[in-house]
Amino acid sequence: YASRGLGDVYKRQVGGMVGTIIPAGLLMVLAVIYLASGGQSQMNFDGNFFPDFSNFDNLVLASSIFLFYAGMEMGGIHVKDMENPAKNYPKAVFIGAAITVIIFVLGTFALGIIIPEKDINLTQSLLVGFDNYFKYVHASWLSPIIAVALAFGVLAGVLTWVAGPSKGIFAVGKAGYLPPFFQKTNANGVQKNILLIQGLAVTLLSLLFVVMPSVQSFYQILSQLTVLLYLIMYLLMFSGAIYLRYNMKKAPRPFRIGSKGNGLMWLIGGLGFCGSLLAFVLSFIPFSYT
């Protein structure tokens, strides 16, 4: 599907609503119903509510918080297609960030309320949480439906993530910074060779399933690898933005950080770079597989 181009992917934006927004809202509503009807919370809201950051395992997991916002920068590729990007693009970023935090934080609370701590894992908790809530409200027949909706949402997300970054690499290739192999397109004008290499890399990483002690340990390692790759990109992006502000002062830009001067660029770029660097270092701290 990604080989059909971004235009075809946009037609599947409904996947984000069906597979992410609606299930997240439903999960939060079910948690409220559960507590309001006398259900016992499996999460203790006491002095141990905040994580123990003296434990290195928790520090490693904390670095994964950067994945909350991973992909939001993809909107920058399409900023030229927006009306009044100087006003609407920051608004879209802040709205997207707020929705992301609400979904992840409140959704995590909802799962912690219904699933005992010893039964929580990284790969199955979402479906287990929905299943437990549906059993509580005597609607177990909804479990397969929500599973299909979540799968549809994941597919829509993958389509966007696959098509978007490869378009950026393709733009670099067309500028002459990559060999001609990376500049070839199919009948739809999509960077076919770049997509094939992406697929090959993911396939090779998937083979780690056969050598890891458990699916959860593989998921955690793959998650940390994703964080590292993203953070490398963010380090380059933040430093590159500051560099280009001085090296290409007169380049036309549909969106500019700060109406004048470079102070705001240094503030945003500097904070982003330092935060990414800290998370990058934390990602190398060994963690347990439990």
Task: List PLM regions with ranges.
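Single conserved hydrophobic/aromatic residue that forms the stacking wall/gate
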Residues: 1-10, 290
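TM-loop-TM module centered on a large, flexible mid-protein loop between adjacent transmembrane helices
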Residues: 94-159, 178-226
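Helix-loop-helix junctions that connect adjacent transmembrane segments
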Residues: 14-147
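Helix-loop-helix module between adjacent transmembrane segments
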Residues: 3-7, 22, 153-156
